[in-house]
Amino acid sequence: MSCRELIILGCSSQQPTRMRNQGAYLFRWNNEGLLFDPGEGTQRQFIFANIAPTVVSRIFISHFHGDHCLGLGSMLMRLNLDKVTHPIHCYYPASGKKYFDRLRYGTIYHETIHVVEHPVDKEGIVEDFGNFRIEARKLDHLVDTLGWRITEPDTIKFIPEKIKAAGLRGPIMQDLLRDDHVTVNGNTIYLKDVSYVRKGDSIAVIADTLPCQSVVDLAKDARIMLCESTYLEEHLHLAKSHYHMTAKQAATQALAAGAQQLVLTHFSARYLNSKEFELEAGKIFPNVAAAEEFRSYPFPKNPSSK
């Protein structure tokens, strides 16, 4: 089974601190590396995390404020230096195309990697292929900002005792998957009677925003909701004026969405102890963690989920 985890490469907001780098988040999932909002210094954070940057296959930029994208150029150059042969898919708000180009071509280097751009100009499904369905929604921030929902496909799981009782084995199993029914010893066996559908897991990544319906829609039943919480409730006035959320607001949104786990991030440099965010949110949403750099948050596949 491929690893399924979120790795925090940085969790500070606008400026880094001695303890926190600007944000960057890596999901390793279904043999892909999904990198979200690589801030300044992301390339170096991979070294500290002991992860090869070559695992990255897709890069998502929520918006073009510097702390969410300044690491893009250096990451593309590093992947170029490492001579990766797989395509690097990049997703970003279409209105920020000129900023993407400036980051990508901001220095002199000979680009040999295959970068596939996906400028997003409308909400909904951006891409749907074998590994994932990628959805985007507009968030409520000062500039065009996208939140993301990534969902793996549903899979059919056989129920062993029912398969055995029906006398099914060997190549006929593939016939059953293809045709939805087979005949064995004069009996018609239907796929639905010997199997169940395991719903694919989803994750949600919520960057800078005020509380809004898009957050709830993106995070509905998500295994992990990675969500900004720039401020504590005592600074609610700052959250409102800068179009950010508090830990309490993030927890309220997670509860409304029915998310399974909430990971808070994007902490203002004014706070030295990020555990305060966990405590504030935990009063509303119990399964919450304040992001810690280089920590892994696994979400193993539950084979019995239906």
From Swiss-Prot:
Pfam families: Lactamase_B. The keyword Acetylation does not apply. Its cofactor is Zn(2+). Coiled coil: none annotated. SUPFAM superfamilies: Metallo-hydrolase/oxidoreductase (SSF56281). It is an enzyme of class 3 (hydrolase). Binds 2 Zn(2+) ions. It comes from the Bacteria. Belongs to the RNase Z family. This is Ribonuclease Z.
